[in-house]
């Protein structure tokens, strides 16, 4: 090979790395955010692909040099320590070592650890992580981020590389803001106009392609400093155009230089306005605060550096005016309303969930202070410490620092703190000692660090790959760049030859390939999981249908009573015409779950959901075949028979159930797999308890399994309901009522299950005495029992409900005047149904005095006035309502009735008046 060809080959290889780095930056900072902020398996796959492309670029560079120097600094060491923590959490440990690291685990799994042969057929738990599948997935994400960030940090000594990275960040921030605004103004409720996300939609607020508005606003805040750099530093080397002459070489005239710089500046200011506007319309309080922090830090720093003059100050004022004007046109009231919550005591005193989540997180850290409970485990751990949450799952601790401490312990929090402090120190060093270009870069990334640090105090943005990747890139770049300027941030330098570096690169490719393959499988599993969840929702629509109205029911229980907004729920087994449809839906759901587990066998919830679905299908199939005996009846018969051998029991079971026994065996297998992958699955422990008689005649086994379920899910309504059923079977009525009372209070959906069990056996007044319901519970009892009870039988319940409403009114009138009118309407409706017409009229008049423009009180006052034969008031109110709804035929009928009644009343008075 000639010298020229060798030189050409070397130059080609050297030019490949920038191309690979640019491609990896686009994948990591544009594609990942577009995949639901990276919280979708496809987003994980994009992140791994970004790391893989970066490694390919590194290998291309290695191939062009016989030897190359590498710097290992604080950032690289912290990434290595983080990976080590994740590995330790996954490795099986001896009982002695595990008890030292996580002593609380023995209290969580008393029957799993102390009864390895009798509880569930499993041995004791031997890992720090309580959800190994989630920890492994989180470790794969962190590995991809670490490799990607490390490769970029190695190139931090070249400012051109950093400028390219900043330009990609600017592009990503701008494109996400544009998508968010366009989707908000002209969207169809789907993400990117085609993806129907399972848990929420894209309407209501600006959230772009993120699943949560807080995450979207956080990403914009992290990119605000880069957009500021793009705006105020209008040349390729980071200097304003008027401060450099080198750029003029690329243009024919000086005027072209200034024209290009002016175009970039104008574009930058428009981009700043759009990003700020999108962040404000996200209505994320923490996100708006983070954007304000980034803007403040950026502008002050740019001013101190000297790139903001009087023209730029004027342009900043115009940009702010543009944003405010846009908000005046659309969204200012919503934004100001959200920001008012920062200073509203009632927001914190009246159901502000973050306080409870933070307390629960602190309790978890106290119990697991060393290495935590495992990466990605917060969603499974928090229900142990949280009070009843009405079915809401808190996937994170609403605070990045607390969440990190819960999942990785104080060790992980300490490492994270070192990284934050090191990044801040590095930024300060560059702002004081760096070159002009380095100061501008430090401002852009320093604003991201400040915004991320502020927002992290009110939300866990670090588990969103799009946000955490950008934050890691900012911190690692600052540390790497500052380590070349100051010995305070040491870095170890070593050399690798071409062969060793290539081997290391190939090893990373293999690891990333394996990680990407698992994420690829997860991406295939996700649609099946979403289908299963939607089928489950359709089953709920079948199961939660209202009961048929009894002939003795209260005809005034009012289908149009807007205050009785509780959902009428009954299990599917009570609706015979729908049993076949429910069985078909369950079969489709089971098929989807089997596909999920085929691609992702470590899914934390699919196994338990599959086990429950099999049990439900078993019961419905038996019911459809005409068998009325329940699984509980079958268990009692099996235990009472006292079979002499296992073979005789299996023969009896096969004769009794036929092929349906296979469904129960598969359900037990699925439940065992569930507790093996996620021992905090209370529902799986309940399934094992229900089916324990299949493998042991000892009733104590079922009791132990139910107790285990209550330990790991002490406030789960379904678990408490099953525990109450088990207590009733065992003859402990007092404990059964206590557990049902807790289940009733746990969630709205569980209330219906408890009430359905009591509907045909216990009067409504006795249910109120036994369950001690709150206002929502009284509403549910009123609605359900009204279908089968007389008004007199419901009188006591409605009086209790009225007292509860009045007590709520006393609270809301002083704290939340917005919620007071609906409560007054509910009180008036109850007073009317109780026969106290005068009190109902007075309540409605009071509601109208507070807000005369409300339609519903006027509409109800018509009925009340007619009941009182106050035809003048009735006519006045009907005419008022008709002015607002002139097309209403029912109001026209009422007007005719009121006029005729008033006329008849006047004629009667004339006929009865004395003659003169």
Predicted features, each with a name:
Residues 96-128, 196-197, 364, 376, ...:
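Extracytosolic (periplasmic/ER-lumenal) interhelical loops and adjacent juxtamembrane/interface segments
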Residues 40-41, 281-289, 460, 713-717, ...:
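Transmembrane helices and adjacent periplasmic/lumenal helix-loop junctions
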Residues 89, 212, 355-394, 401-404, ...:
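TM-adjacent membrane-interface loops and short helices in multi-pass inner/ER membrane proteins
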Residues 107-114, 199-203, 342-355, 528-546, ...:
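Short extracytoplasmic/periplasmic juxtamembrane "stem" segments immediately C-terminal to an N-terminal membrane anchor
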Residues 2-36, 45-60, 83-93, 115-119, ...:
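Alpha-helical transmembrane segments of multi-pass inner-membrane proteins
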Residues 385, 390-392, 520-802, 813-833, ...:
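Soluble catalytic regions of membrane-associated enzymes that act on cell-envelope
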């Amino acid at each position: 090979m000639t010298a020229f060809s060798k030189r050409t080959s070397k130059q080609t290889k050297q030019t490949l790395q920038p191309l690979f780095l640019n491609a990896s930056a686009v994948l990591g900072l544009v594609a990942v955010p577009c995949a639901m902020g990276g919280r979708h398996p496809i987003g994980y796959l994009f992140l791994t692909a970004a790391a893989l492309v970066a490694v390919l670029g590194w290998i291309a560079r290695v191939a062009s040099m016989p030897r190359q120097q590498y710097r290992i600094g604080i950032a690289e060491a912290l990434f290595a320590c983080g990976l080590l923590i994740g590995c330790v959490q996954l490795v099986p440990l001896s009982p002695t070592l595990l008890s030292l690291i996580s002593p609380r685990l023995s209290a969580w799994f008393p029957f799993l650890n102390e009864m390895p042969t009798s509880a569930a057929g499993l041995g004791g738990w031997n890992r720090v992580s309580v959800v190994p599948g989630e920890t492994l997935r989180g470790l794969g994400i962190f590995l991809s981020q670490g490799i990607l960030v490390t490769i970029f940090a190695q190139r931090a000594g070249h400012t051109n590389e950093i400028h390219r990275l900043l330009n990609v960040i600017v592009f990503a921030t701008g494109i996400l803001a544009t998508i968010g605004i366009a989707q908000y103004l002209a969207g169809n409720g789907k993400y990117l106009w085609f993806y129907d996300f399972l848990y929420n939609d894209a309407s209501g607020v600006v959230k772009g392609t993120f699943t949560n508005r807080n995450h979207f606003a956080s990403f914009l805040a992290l990119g605000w400093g880069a957009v500021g750099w793009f705006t105020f530093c209008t040349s390729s080397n980071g200097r304003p155009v008027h401060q450099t002459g080198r750029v003029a070489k690329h243009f024919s005239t000086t005027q072209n230089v200034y024209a290009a710089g002016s175009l970039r500046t104008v574009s930058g200011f428009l981009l700043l306005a759009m990003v700020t506007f999108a962040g404000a319309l996200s209505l994320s309080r923490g996100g708006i605060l983070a954007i304000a922090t980034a803007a403040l830090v950026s502008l002050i720093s740019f001013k101190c550096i000297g790139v903001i003059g009087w023209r730029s100050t004027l342009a900043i004022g115009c940009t702010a005016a543009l944003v405010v004007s846009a908000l005046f046109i659309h969204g200012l009231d919503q934004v100001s309303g959200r920001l008012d919550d920062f200073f509203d005591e009632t927001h914190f005193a009246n159901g502000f969930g973050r306080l409870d989540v933070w307390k629960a997180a602190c309790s978890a850290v106290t119990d697991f202070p060393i290495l935590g409970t495992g990466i990605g485990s917060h969603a499974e751990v928090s229900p142990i410490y949280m009070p009843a949450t009405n079915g809401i799952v808190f996937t994170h601790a609403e605070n990045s620092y607390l969440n990190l401490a819960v999942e990785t312990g104080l060790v992980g929090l300490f490492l994270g703190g070192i990284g934050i402090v090191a990044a801040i120190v590095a930024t300060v060093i560059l702002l004081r000692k760096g070159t002009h270009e380095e100061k501008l870069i430090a401002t852009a990334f320093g604003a991201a660090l400040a915004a991320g640090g502020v927002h992290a105090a009110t939300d866990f943005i670090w588990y969103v790959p799009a946000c955490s990747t950008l934050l890691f890139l900012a911190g690692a770049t600052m540390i790497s760049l500052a380590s070349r300027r100051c010995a305070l941030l040491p870095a170890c330098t070593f050399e690798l030859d071409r062969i060793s570096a290539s081997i290391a690169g190939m090893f990373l490719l293999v690891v990333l390939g394996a990680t990407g393959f698992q994420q690829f499988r997860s991406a295939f599993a996700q649609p099946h999981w979403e289908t299963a969840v939607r089928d489950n929702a359709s089953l709920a629509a079948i199961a939660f249908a209202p009961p048929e109205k009894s002939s003795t029911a209260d005809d005034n229980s009012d289908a149009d009573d807007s205050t009785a907004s509780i959902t009428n729920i009954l299990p599917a087994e009570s609706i015979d015409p729908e049993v076949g449809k429910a069985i078909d839906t369950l079969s489709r759901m089971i098929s989807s779950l089997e596909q999920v587990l085929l691609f992702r066998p470590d899914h934390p919830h699919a196994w338990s959901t599959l086990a429950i679905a099999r049990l439900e299908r078993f019961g419905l199939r038996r019911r459809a075949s005409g068998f009325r005996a329940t699984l509980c009846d079958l268990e009692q018969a099996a235990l009472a028979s006292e079979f002499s051998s296992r073979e005789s029991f299996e023969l009896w079971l096969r004769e009794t159930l036929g092929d349906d026994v296979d469904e129960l065996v598969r359900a037990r297998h699925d439940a065992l797999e569930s507790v093996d992958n996620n021992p905090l699955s209370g529902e799986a422990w309940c399934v094992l308890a229900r089916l324990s008689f299949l493998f042991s005649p000892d009733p104590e086994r079922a009791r132990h399994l139910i107790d285990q379920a209550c330990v790991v899910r002490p406030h789960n309504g379904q678990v408490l309901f099953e525990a109450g059923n088990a207590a009733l079977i065992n003859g402990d009525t007092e404990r059964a009522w206590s557990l049902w009372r807790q289940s009733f209070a746990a969630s709205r959906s569980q209330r219906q299950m408890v009430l359905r069990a009591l509907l045909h056996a216990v009067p409504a007044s006795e249910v109120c005495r036994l369950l001690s319901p709150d206002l929502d519970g009284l509403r549910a009892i009123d609605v359900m029992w009204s279908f089968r009870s007389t008004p007199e039988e419901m009188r006591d319940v409605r009086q209790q409900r009225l007292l509860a409403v009045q007590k709520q009114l006393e609270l809301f009138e002083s704290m939340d005047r917005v919620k007071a009118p609906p409560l007054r309407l509910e009180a008036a409706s109850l007073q009317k149904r109780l026969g106290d017409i005068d009190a109902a009229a007075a309540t409605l008049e009071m509601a109208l005095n507070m807000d005369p423009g409300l339609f519903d009180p006027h509409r109800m006052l018509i009925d009340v006035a007619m009941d009182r034969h106050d035809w003048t008031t009735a006519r006045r109110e009907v005419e008022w309502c008709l002015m607002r709804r002139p097309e209403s035929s029912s109001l026209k009928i009422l007007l005719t009735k009121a006029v005729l009644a008033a006329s008849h009343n006047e004629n009667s008075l004339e006929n009865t008046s004395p003659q003169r």
